Curated annotation (Swiss-Prot):
Keywords: Cytoplasm, GTP-binding, Hydrolase, Nucleotide-binding, Ribonucleoprotein, RNA-binding, Signal recognition particle. The lineage of its organism: Bacteria, Pseudomonadati, Pseudomonadota, Gammaproteobacteria, Pasteurellales. It comes from the Bacteria. Pfam families: SRP54, SRP54_N, SRP_SPB. Involved in targeting and insertion of nascent membrane proteins into the cytoplasmic membrane. Binds to the hydrophobic signal sequence of the ribosome-nascent chain (RNC) as it emerges from the ribosomes. The SRP-RNC complex is then targeted to the cytoplasmic membrane where it interacts with the SRP receptor FtsY. Interaction with FtsY leads to the transfer of the RNC complex to the Sec translocase for insertion into the membrane, the hydrolysis of GTP by both Ffh and FtsY, and the dissociation of the SRP-FtsY complex into the individual components. It comes from Haemophilus influenzae (strain ATCC 51907 / DSM 11121 / KW20 / Rd). Gene3D superfamilies: P-loop containing nucleotide triphosphate hydrolases, Signal recognition particle SRP54, nucleotide-binding domain, Signal recognition particle, SRP54 subunit, M-domain. GO terms for biological process: SRP-dependent cotranslational protein targeting to membrane. This is Signal recognition particle protein. Its main location: cytoplasm. Composed of three domains: the N-terminal N domain, which is responsible for interactions with the ribosome, the central G domain, which binds GTP, and the C-terminal M domain, which binds the RNA and the signal sequence of the RNC.
Length: 462
């Protein structure tokens, strides 16, 4: 997320953090570099001008130079102003109304609006325990109705049927009546997208808005369109009262111009980030956490939240009890660990949220391939129950059969078994001898046995 901007800013700010005193002369070059980094990230010019002016004013203030580490204070100022540009605090959905709370979704074609409806429905059902109904009022694209129906089934929410022959306003009214009748907590209405903001589109959505009187009107924009995303949202907001923005395709946006421009140009908060194609890939937008990630400081809070949501407490407790009793760590246990890792978005997703992840060498980053976990799981799935319980019996012919069944090579099976053997030994060391032995075990595991994770052993040496 925002790799180019993050790399450029981290490199620029590293040069000033050691300064003993900040003067107009020694911050001039740094501010010029920051300005260039923001413009290259496609941040809107008025936003860049205001940002630079505020950073300069604060950096030359008396309090900063009274500090023992003015360079570090400068970094804090940049972080604070980044947060302010994006909205300072997380603004969650407002559902404080007589149920059903209606959420109207709008956006241009191809921005990921319908997918965002499915993600939002899943988010509300799983994290807020809401009974959700979704409906498509997009009568211009038959595939949109079918797409939303399929999404609704996959995320476990109800779908209100609609047809291309119906009027969008009639669809909206019927869905609202049904939501009231069946005591739904939330109704999410998907509307038609267009290639650009036009009068016909605005008139239609105004009518739908008037019929529903939604408590939330969210505009979905593609992060990769940069400041154009902010300008489109502004034009839309002038015709319809938006309450917030969902920024999609953030995982593919290396620049970050949209995230830094939207709040100041539209006056509306970013409420969610779409960070992938999967239905769980929707994150509440926290300006402070995003600013921290942009500056290479990681996002530990989000990582902890991911862990709390993804880890099955019951399974974790069983594993802990098994470990205490001294039972063997089996290949089935290993597979469970791989599944938990996948649920959290994979190793790379976790690494990106750790402080200092930006300083990892490209060699290490290239070694972390999340497809590797899929391959490892497939190999274990191709084993019989007996083989999983007794990996020592897996010799030549069995290894060839497992490789064939999992669509992998024999050397992949060999690597996995070697890695598993080292994990077993590490578990035994942990039972016998505490943290020092555990760290040495982990170093050995990550240094050689993990195949694709080879270079990560260096993390424990720094």
């Amino acid at each position: 997320m925002f790799e180019n901007l993050s790399d450029r800013l981290s490199k620029t700010l590293r040069n000033i953090t050691g300064k003993g005193r900040l003067t107009e002369d020694n911050i001039k070059e740094t501010l010029r570099e920051v300005r260039m980094a923001l413009l290259e990230a496609d941040v809107a010019l008025p936003v860049v001008r205001e940002f630079i002016a505020k950073v300069k004013e604060s950096a030359l203030g008396e309090e900063v130079n009274k500090s023992l580490t003015p360079g570090q204070e400068f970094l804090k100022i940049v972080q604070r102003e980044l947060e302010k540009a994006m909205g300072e605090a997380n603004e969650s959905l407002n559902l404080a109304t007589q149920p059903p709370a209606v959420i109207l979704m709008a956006g241009l074609q191809g921005a990921g609006k319908t997918t965002s409806v499915g993600k939002l429905a899943k988010f509300l059902r799983e994290r807020h325990k809401k009974k959700v109904l979704v409906v498509s009022a997009d009568v211009y694209r038959p595939a949109a109705i079918k797409q939303l129906e399929t999404l609704a089934q996959s995320v476990g929410v109800d779908f209100f049927p609609s047809d291309v022959k119906q009027n969008p306003v009639d669809i909206a009214k019927s869905a609202l009546a049904d939501a009231k009748l069946k005591f739904y907590d939330v109704l999410i209405v998907d509307t038609a997208g267009r290639l650009h903001v036009d009068t016909e589109m605005m008139d239609e959505i105004k009518q739908v808005h008037a019929a529903l009187n939604p408590i939330e009107t969210l505009f979905t924009v593609d992060a990769m369109t940069g400041q154009d995303a902010a300008n489109t949202a502004k034009a839309f907001n002038e015709a319809l009262p938006l309450t917030g923005v969902i920024l999609t395709k953030v995982d593919g946006d290396a620049r970050g111009g949209a995230a830094l421009s939207i709040r100041q140009i539209t006056g509306k908060p970013i409420k969610f980030l779409g960070v992938g194609e999967k239905t769980e890939a929707l994150e509440p937008f926290h300006p402070d956490r995003v600013a921290s990630r942009i500056l290479g400081m990681g996002d530990v809070l989000s990582l902890i939240e991911d862990l709390e949501r993804s880890v099955d407490r019951e399974k974790a407790e069983k594993m802990a009890q098994k470990f205490k009793k001294g039972d063997d760590f089996t290949l089935d246990d290993f597979r469970e660990q791989l599944i938990e890792m996948k649920k959290m978005g994979g190793m790379m997703s976790m690494l990106e949220k750790l402080p200092g992840a930006k300083n990892l060498s490209e060699h290490v980053k290239n070694q972390v391939d999340d497809k590797m976990f899929v391959k490892m799981e497939a190999i274990i799935n191709s084993m019989t129950l007996k083989e999983r319980a007794n990996p020592d019996i897996i010799k030549g012919s069995r290894r060839r059969r497992i490789a064939l069944g999992s669509g992998t090579q024999v050397q992949d099976v060999n690597k996995l078994l070697k890695q598993f053997d080292e994990m077993q030994r590490m578990m035994k060391k942990m039972r016998k001898g505490g943290m020092a032995k555990m760290m040495r075990g982990m170093q050995g595991l990550m240094g050689g046995g993990l195949g694709g994770l080879g270079g990560l052993g260096g993390m424990f040496k720094r």
